[in-house]
UniProtKB/Swiss-Prot annotation:
Annotated binding of Mg(2+) 1, by residue: 90, 223
Annotated keywords: Amino-acid biosynthesis, Aromatic amino acid biosynthesis, Glycosyltransferase, Magnesium, Metal-binding, Transferase, Tryptophan biosynthesis
GO function term, MF aspect, one: anthranilate phosphoribosyltransferase activity
GO (cellular component) term, any one: cytosol
Requisite cofactors: Mg(2+)
HAMAP family on file: TrpD (MF_00211)
Name of the protein: Anthranilate phosphoribosyltransferase
Functional note: Catalyzes the transfer of the phosphoribosyl group of 5-phosphorylribose-1-pyrophosphate (PRPP) to anthranilate to yield N-(5'-phosphoribosyl)-anthranilate (PRA).
Binding, 5-phospho-alpha-D-ribose 1-diphosphate: 78, 81-82, 86, 88-91, 106-114, 118
Organism of provenance: Staphylococcus aureus (strain JH9)
Gene Ontology BP term (one): L-tryptophan biosynthetic process
C-alpha cells in the first residue's frame, strides 16, 4: 500500500508513515506534483493529535537532534491562514512582552496567505533575524530574538512552492508555531481553525511546555480579538488543559470589529506597529496588542492574572519601554 493510499484510507497513521511523508516533503529531488498530492491529501483528512506530535518531532529531530534549550524562553505567534490580512499583531506584541524582561524567541516566516508576514515586517524595520547558535547571546543582551523559519529550517524551502500552489492553510500552518528550534518554557499560539485548538494544546503539552495558551480569536482570527468571545485552551504548570472563553470587554477594552485590524504592505504594517509602540495610536489596534500582550505576560508568569497582564502591557507602552525595545533591536 502506497503512502498516498494510506493517507486516504487509514484513520491513524504510524510514526513511520509520518516520517516518510516528511522525508518526501523536504526532499530537494522529489517533484512538486508528488508533494502537492501528498500534502493536499493529508491536509484534507481528519488529523489525529499524535500525528501532529510525530510531524513536529520529525522536523525538529531532522534539524536539531539535540534541541537547544533556554530556560524561561517564550514564543508568541499564530498559525496564519486566517485570511484576515491583519497587521502583524504578534510581532508588535513581542516588543511589549520582551520589554517586561521575558525572554522571547519569536520564530516567524514570510507571508504565505497574507500581504506581510513577520519576516517581511522585520525587513522593513531593518531588524536582523538571529541565527540559532547566536540566540543565547542576543537573549542575554536584549531579551528578544527573531529567528526566520527559512534560516532555522532550510529544509522548509522545499515545501514553500507546494504551499503556494495549494493556496490555503495546510497542516504546515499548525506545525509552524510548534517547531521553534529551542525547547521553550512558555508559549502562546493563535490557531486559525477552532476545531484544532485541543489538538494543538495537547501537542504543546507533549513538547514539554510548562505553561501555554492556545487560542482562536472571535470571528475567525488567529489572535485574541475585541469582536466577541475568544476560545482559549490553557496549559497550566500542573499539566492540566482547561478551556474557556475570554471577552475583551470583561477587561475594560472596547468592542471592535476585526476589520479594524486590517493591515497592508510591510511599509503600512510598519507604520501601524510603530504608532502603537510610540503611543500615538490609541485606537482598537492598540487594544488588540494590549490584550495579546497581557495574555502572554500572564502565561510567562510575569503577572498572576490576565487583567494584571493587560495593565502591565499598558504601562510598558505608556512609559516608553516597548518603543525602547524596538530601537534596541534596530541597534540604535
Amino acid at each position: 500500500m502506497t503512502l498516498l493510499t494510506r493517507i486516504k484510507t487509514e484513520t491513524i497513521l504510524l510514526e513511520s508513515d509520518i516520517k516518510e511523508l516528511i522525508d518526501i516533503l523536504i526532499s530537494p529531488s522529489i517533484g512538486t506534483d508528488i508533494k502537492y498530492e501528498l500534502l493536499s491529501s493529508y491536509s484534507e483528512r481528519e488529523i489525529q493529535q499524535q500525528e501532529l506530535t510525530y510531524i513536529v518531532r520529525s522536523l525538529i529531530n531532522t534539524m536539531y537532534p539535540h534541541q537547544p534549550c533556554y530556560e524561561g524562553a517564550m514564543c508568541v505567534c499564530g498559525t496564519g491562514g486566517d485570511k484576515s490580512n491583519s497587521f502583524n499583531i504578534s510581532t508588535t506584541v513581542a516588543f511589549v512582552v520582551a520589554s517586561a524582561g521575558v525572554k522571547v524567541i519569536k520564530h516567524g516566516n514570510k507571508s504565505i496567505t497574507s500581504n506581510s508576514g513577520s519576516t517581511d515586517l522585520l525587513n522593513q524595520m531593518n531588524i536582523q533575524t538571529t541565527t540559532v547558535d547566536d540566540t543565547p547571546n542576543q537573549l542575554n543582551e536584549k531579551d528578544l530574538v527573531f529567528i526566520g523559519a527559512t534560516e532555522s529550517y532550510p529544509i522548509m524551502k522545499y515545501m514553500q512552492p507546494v504551499r503556494k500552489m495549494i493556496g490555503k492553510p495546510t497542516i504546515l500552518n499548525l506545525v509552524g508555531p510548534l517547531i521553534n528550534p529551542y525547547h521553550l518554557t512558555y508559549q502562546m499560539v493563535g490557531v486559525f481553525d477552532p476545531t484544532k485548538l485541543k489538538l494543538v494544546a495537547k501537542t504543546i503539552k507533549d513538547l514539554g511546555r510548562k505553561r501555554a495558551i492556545v487560542l482562536h480569536g472571535a470571528n475567525g482570527m488567529d489572535e485574541a480579538t475585541l469582536s466577541g468571545d475568544n476560545l482559549i485552551y490553557e496549559l497550566t504548570e500542573d499539566g492540566e488543559i482547561k478551556n474557556y472563553t475570554l471577552n475583551a470587554t470583561d477587561y475594560g477594552l472596547k468592542h471592535a470589529p476585526n476589520s479594524d485590524f486590517k493591515g497592508g504592505s510591510p511599509e503600512e504594517n510598519l507604520a501601524i506597529s510603530l504608532n502603537i509602540l510610540n503611543g500615538k495610536d490609541q485606537s482598537s489596534r492598540r487594544d488588540v496588542v494590549l490584550l495579546n500582550a497581557g495574555l502572554s505576560l500572564y502565561v510567562a508568569e510575569k503577572v498572576d492574572t490576565i487583567a494584571e497582564g493587560i495593565e502591565l502591557a499598558t504601562t510598558l507602552i505608556d512609559n516608553g519601554e516597548a518603543l525602547k525595545k524596538y530601537h534596541q533591536m534596530r541597534g540604535e
